[in-house]
């Protein structure tokens, strides 16, 4: 591992009734597997249907995401297997599961007895494989399986020799086609997991001393807190799939893989703190 971390903080505005405090943190980490145990070329940390793997291999970054994708020729045209009628495939290293870039921004604004705290959290540079979306596509539950439902599906490209190729899948055979489409090419269910989130917002009010004394207390605060309030940015592909970029379901080594985990929740609460 080789990286850098930067942390900055300051108070841009400090007036008698208004203050603005800010904190920023940035880190970047690069990893590279230098050696594995004798006799081991690839260490598989996790896997899914159709062969997607989270691996460690010498010369590659930690938690590399490897998966089959639809094969294309140098012109970008899909290559088909004439014997099966399906798209040909090839194994590819798509990205890493651990985000190399982490950033956080904290702002606290105070005006009189009120304060507002906003925490922005972001991660960049990683990818994640969604087993959930792969299953849903196999069973015809995603928009990827809409083409051909009314009049059949025509696929075209080149065969493995480079000759033009066309095949028509009748409506009655589409379940077979999409079952293969969803299982044989898991690379299409690997998403960029970049995000910027409003992680936390707190509105706090410091109760006046005159009111606190009525209950014989020293101080009191009332706070409205929200967690995971909004995704301010995520990649278009993962947004259209309706997925949260933080789709990891494990704290283990297989970062970059998600099964059928429960979605992230938004939490809103009120806290009253009284000091006697």
Can you describe what each PLM-predicted range is?
Residues 2-8, 101-107, 114, 198-203, ...:
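Hydrophobic, lipid-facing positions within transmembrane beta-strands of outer-membrane proteins
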Residues 3, 78-89, 171-187, 246-253:
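Flexible, solvent-exposed coil segments and beta strand-coil junctions
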Residues 4, 16, 113-118, 210-211:
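Repeated loop/turn-to-beta-strand initiation elements of outer-membrane beta-barrel proteins
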Residues 20-22, 105, 111, 116-118, ...:
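Transmembrane beta-strands of outer-membrane beta-barrel proteins
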Residues 11-97, 137, 144-146, 154-162, ...:
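Conserved small-residue
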Residues 10-12, 26-32, 111-113, 122-126, ...:
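Transmembrane beta-strands of outer-membrane beta-barrel pores
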Residues 123-221, 225-227:
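Extracytoplasmic gating/loop element in the C-terminal half of outer-membrane beta-barrel translocons
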Residues 1, 44-66, 73-75, 151, ...:
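C-terminal beta-signal and terminal closure region of outer-membrane beta-barrel proteins
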């Amino acid at each position: 591992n080789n990286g850098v971390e930067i942390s900055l903080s300051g108070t841009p505005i400090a007036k008698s009734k208004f203050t603005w405090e800010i904190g920023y943190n940035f880190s970047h980490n690069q990893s590279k597997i230098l050696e594995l145990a004798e006799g081991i070329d690839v260490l598989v940390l996790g896997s899914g249907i159709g062969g997607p793997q989270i691996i460690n291999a010498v010369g590659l970054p930690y938690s590399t995401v490897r998966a089959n994708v639809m094969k294309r020729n140098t012109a970008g045209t899909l290559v088909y297997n004439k014997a099966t009628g399906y798209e040909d495939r090839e194994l590819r290293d798509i990205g890493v599961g651990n985000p190399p870039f982490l950033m956080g921004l904290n702002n606290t604004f105070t005006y009189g007895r009120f304060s507002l705290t906003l925490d922005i959290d972001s991660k960049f540079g990683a990818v994640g494989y969604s087993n959930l979306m792969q299953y849903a596509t196999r069973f015809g539950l995603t928009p990827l399986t809409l083409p051909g439902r009314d009049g059949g599906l025509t696929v075209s490209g080149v065969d493995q020799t480079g000759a033009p190729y066309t095949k028509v899948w009748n409506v009655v055979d589409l379940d077979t086609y999409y079952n293969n489409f969803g299982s044989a090419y898991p690379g299409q269910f690997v998403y960029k997991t970049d995000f910027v989130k409003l992680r936390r917002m707190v509105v706090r009010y410091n109760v006046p001393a005159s009111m606190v004394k009525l209950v014989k207390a020293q101080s009191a605060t009332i706070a409205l807190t929200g967690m995971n309030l909004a995704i301010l940015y995520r990649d278009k592909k993962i947004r259209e799939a309706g997925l949260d970029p933080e789709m990891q379901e494990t704290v283990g080594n297989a970062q970059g893989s998600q099964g059928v985990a429960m979605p992230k929740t938004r939490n809103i609460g009120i806290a009253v703190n009284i000091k006697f």
